[in-house]
Amino acid sequence: MFEGPLQDLIDELSRLPGVGPKSAQRIAFHLLNVDPSDITRLQEALGGVRDGVQFCRICCNISREEVCRICSDSGRDGGTICVVEEPKDIQVIERTGEFSGRYHVLGGALDPLANIGPRELNISTLLQRIGGVLPDRELADSTPENKLFDATPTVREVILATDPNTEGEATASYLGRLLKDFPDLVISRLASGMPLGGDLEFVDELTLSRALSGRLQI
């Protein structure tokens, strides 16, 4: 154990995903030896993320504006919505060049052990985008007033691109049942070939591209 600000920094770095105590210690000692201007830029970048990033009011992706660049792009196919767990998953799919529709970010996956149920995810706003009504009364009661917006009547297909793990599959199954209430809506899931038990962000572009193009209707 170190003392004072150094140990405080190590403790805070250790709280970051994927950063253990040893990695946090290496990063902290690296920061002790960098130019002060590098520290200043890091502080400014952290402040910029906190103050300059918000969530798109339509798809819940991270954005600098009220509506993100993808939702604002008239060239995107508004009739197809790809549902993902986190904003980082959008970047993975975009790199394939296979998808030209729009997205919806759930903000996680169903996980009863972590007390994450439907009300903790951005499910109600997805249902509103599709049909403007909420078939689940519990979800309707949990929707903040400032989240309401008109439905997109041209939505033809919803692609469930949650992670191929236990939580992701449970979330896709739950959403599939909810979306069955919307007539004429095609509901699809990424095709087989995705590694079971993994996260979307670690799937290579070729595999993901094939999974998108070969998606299966459910």
Curated annotation (Swiss-Prot):
**A single MF term (Gene Ontology):** DNA binding
Please cite one Gene Ontology biological process associated with this protein.
DNA recombination
In terms of CDD domains, this protein maps to:
TOPRIM_recR
Quote the Pfam families the UniProt record gives. RecR_C, RecR_HhH, RecR_ZnF, Toprim_4
Q: Which UniProt keywords apply?
A: DNA damage, DNA recombination, DNA repair, Metal-binding, Zinc, Zinc-finger
The Toprim domain covers 79-195
| InterPro entries on file | DNA_Rcmb_RecR, Hlx-hairpin-Hlx_DNA-bd_motif, Rcmb_RecR, Rcmb_RecR_Znf, TOPRIM_dom, TOPRIM_RecR
- Which chain segments does UniProt annotate as zinc-finger regions (C4-type)? 56-71
The UniProt family comment states: Belongs to the RecR family.
| PANTHER family the record matches | RECOMBINATION PROTEIN RECR
What this chain does, per the record? May play a role in DNA repair. It seems to be involved in an RecBC-independent recombinational process of DNA repair. It may act with RecF and RecO.
Write the protein's name: Recombination protein RecR
Q: By which gene is this protein encoded?
A: recR
